[in-house]
Amino acid sequence: MKQGTVKWFNAEKGFGFIEVEGENDVFVHFSAINQDGYKSLEEGQAVEFEVVEGDRGPQAANVVKL
């Protein structure tokens, strides 16, 4: 599992990016967020996640808010 910080997240569109120190930003889709109810992330929020290979490159999976 990697740890990072939410760089930005557009709740209306349901996606954003997670910043990982020393690495490229990782795409995150709302469907990858592990929580019940409304799935969204806040800018600057610390998260833990796995990286999987998506259709357009690396993306976050199993995202957990810290």
Swiss-Prot record:
This is Cold shock protein CspA. Signal peptide: none annotated. SMART domains: CSP. Induction: Up-regulated in response to low temperature. Residues 1-66 form the CSD domain. Pfam families: CSD. Its main location: cytoplasm. Involved in cold stress response and in the susceptibility to an antimicrobial peptide of human cathepsin G (CG117-136). Regulates yellowish-orange pigment production through a still unclear SigB-dependent mechanism. The keyword Heme does not apply. One of its GO terms (molecular function) is nucleic acid binding. The gene is cspA. GO terms for cellular component: cytoplasm. CDD domains: CSP_CDS (cd04458). It comes from Staphylococcus aureus (strain NCTC 8325 / PS 47). The lineage of its organism: Bacteria, Bacillati, Bacillota, Bacilli, Bacillales. Keywords: Cytoplasm. The keyword Cell inner membrane does not apply. GO terms for biological process: regulation of gene expression. It is found in: Cytoplasm.
